[in-house]
Amino acid sequence: MIKIGDIELSSNVILAPMSDITDLEFRKLVKRFGAGLVVSEMIASRAMVVKSRQSMQKCAIVHDDPTSACVQLAGCEPNVIAEAAKMNEDMGAKIIDLNFGCPAKKVVGGYAGSALMRDEQLAAKIFEATVKAVKIPITVKMRMGWDDNTKNAPDLAKIAESSGVQMVTVHGRTRCQFYSGNADWDFIRSVKEAVKIPVIANGDITNFAKAKEALQKSGADGIMVGRGAYGKPWLVSQIAHYLKTGEEKPAPSIAEQLDIVTEHYNAILDYYGESVGVPIARKHIGWYSSGLPSSAEFRGAVNLMNDPAEVKEKIAEFYTSVMKE
C-alpha cells in the first residue's frame, strides 16, 4: 500500500485536484465512497498568504482524516509557497501537494503550474523551501514536460525526491498538449524507474479497463482519477475495488443516485449559501444526469432556475421519471 510519510492510504486510487470541482463537499462525498486520497482544488499561494476569502474556502479540509486533508498549492515564489504551506499545516492540513502540472494560460502566464517544468533550478528552490517550512509530507503533481522536446519529468522527479518530496504524480501529457491526444502511460514508467518514492499515473483514467492498463503500462504505484469522476463520485472507489478484486462493482441504482445528487445539492447550498450555491450546483447536476433519458431537457430547465426549492423538485421529478422507464 502507498505511504506518504507516515500516512498510509487505504487504496492506491486517488481523486485528482480539479479547479472549481474538488471543493470540500465533493471531496467529502468521494472520500465516503472509498478513495485512497482526495486533493483540494488548486490554491494560489499568494492569495493564500493574504487570506483571500476564496482561498480560505478552497483549503477547507476534513480534520479527522489525514487522507482528506491534502491541499494543493500553486505559485512560483519559493518563500510565498513555503509560507502558504505552513499556514495550511497550522490549519490542520496533513499533506501539501505542489502544482507543477496545470496547463491553463492564466497559470503558466504567471510562471506557475507546468511552466515550472521549464526551470529546474527554480523548481528545486520551491521543493526545498516547502519541505523545510513544514513537518508534514510534500508531494508534487507534474506533466511529462513542457513539450515533446522537453519531457523532463524523470529529471524533475529526481530533483523532487532529493529535496525531500515524498510522492510524484505524472499526467501523461505535455503542457503543450493540454488535454488533446491520449495520455502516454508508457512514458510514466521512466519516472517510476528514476525514483524510489511512490509514483502515481494520471490522465484518461475513466473506467476499469483504462485503470488496469494505466497501471500495467506505467508500472506506477497508483493512479489518479480526474475528469472521469465528473458526476460519478463513486468511480474512484469502483476502480479501487476492481483493481483489488477484479470485480466490476455496478454504479449506484437510479434511486440511489437521486439520494446522492440531492445530498450533494443540499451540501453545496449549506456550504456556499443559496445565491452562490445554486449556480455552482448546476454543473454537477448536469454531469450526474449525463447519459440518462431526456437529460438534455432536464439540464436546460435546471440551468434557468434560481429557486433552490424549484431545482430540488425538478431533480426529484427527473430521477423519478427515469426510474419509471
From Swiss-Prot:
Record key words, sorted: Flavoprotein, FMN, NADP, Oxidoreductase, RNA-binding, tRNA processing, tRNA-binding
Catalytic function, reaction form: a 5,6-dihydrouridine in tRNA + NAD(+) = a uridine in tRNA + NADH + H(+); a 5,6-dihydrouridine in tRNA + NADP(+) = a uridine in tRNA + NADPH + H(+)
Molecular function GO labels: flavin adenine dinucleotide binding; tRNA binding; tRNA dihydrouridine synthase activity
Pfam families per UniProt: Dus
SUPFAM superfamilies (UniProt xref): FMN-linked oxidoreductases
Binding-site list for FMN: P17, M18, S19, Q72, K141, N202, G203, D204, G226, R227
Transmembrane helix as UniProt keyword: no
Keyword Oxidoreductase: yes
Active site, renumbered: C102
Enzyme Commission number: 1.3.1.-
Cofactor(s) demanded: FMN
InterPro entries: Aldolase_TIM, DUS-like_FMN-bd, DUS_fam, DusB-like, tRNA-dHydroUridine_Synthase_C, tRNA_hU_synthase_CS
Family to which the UniProt record says this protein belongs: Belongs to the Dus family.
Task performed by this protein: Catalyzes the synthesis of 5,6-dihydrouridine (D), a modified base found in the D-loop of most tRNAs, via the reduction of the C5-C6 double bond in target uridines.
Protein name: Probable tRNA-dihydrouridine synthase
Species this chain originates from: Rickettsia felis (strain ATCC VR-1525 / URRWXCal2)
Lineage: Bacteria, Pseudomonadati, Pseudomonadota, Alphaproteobacteria, Rickettsiales
